C-alpha cells in the first residue's frame, strides 16, 4: 500500500506544492542580532524545531520517491537526490538530532516540572547549547530556502 501511495503522490506536483506551502508557514525561531525569536521567552521545539526538518524531509522523499520512513534516512537519501553537499547533508542530520534531543529532554523534564512538554526557554541553556541550537535553526533555514526555490513558484 505504501508503494502505491508513493507512486500516486510522486507524480502529483499540486499536492507536493501544497505540502511545501504548508511547511514554509513556520520559520525557524531566529531573531535579530543572534537572538532567538521567542513567545513569552519560549520556543516550541516541536513546531518550530523538529517539524521543520520532518516536513522538508517528507516532502522531498515523496517528490523523489524515497521509501525511507524516518527523518534521518530521508534527509540522507533526499539530500543526495537534490544534490546537497555531503557536509550539508551531515549538517542537516546533526541539526535535526540536536533539536530532537532537546525536545526529548524537555519532554522528560516536563514530567516533573509540569511545564509544557515542547516549550523550551533557549536562554536556560548554557552558551554552547545556545550556539548549537542557533546553528541547528540556521541549518533548518537553509533547507527551507532550498524548498522555496524548488516549490514556491
Language-model segment annotations:
Residues 1-153:
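A nucleotide- and high-energy phosphate-metabolite-utilizing enzyme signature
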Amino acid at each position: 500500500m505504501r508503494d502505491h501511495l508513493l507512486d500516486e503522490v510522486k507524480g502529483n506536483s499540486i499536492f507536493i506544492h501544497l505540502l511545501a506551502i504548508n511547511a514554509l508557514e513556520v520559520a525557524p525561531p531566529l531573531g535579530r542580532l543572534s537572538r532567538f525569536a521567542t513567545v513569552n521567552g519560549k520556543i516550541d521545539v516541536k513546531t518550530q524545531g523538529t517539524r521543520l526538518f520532518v516536513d522538508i524531509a517528507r516532502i522531498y522523499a515523496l517528490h523523489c520517491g524515497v521509501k525511507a520512513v524516518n527523518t534521518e534516512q530521508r534527509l540522507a537519501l533526499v539530500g543526495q537526490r537534490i544534490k546537497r553537499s555531503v557536509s550539508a547533508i551531515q549538517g542537516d542530520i546533526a541539526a535535526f538530532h540536536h533539536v530532537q534531543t532537546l525536545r526529548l529532554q524537555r519532554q522528560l523534564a516536563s514530567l516533573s516540572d509540569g511545564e509544557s512538554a515542547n516549550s523550551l526557554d533557549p536562554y536556560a541553556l548554557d552558551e554552547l547549547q545556545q550556539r548549537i541550537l542557533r546553528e541547528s535553526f540556521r541549518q533548518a533555514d537553509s533547507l527551507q530556502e532550498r524548498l522555496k526555490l524548488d516549490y514556491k513558484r
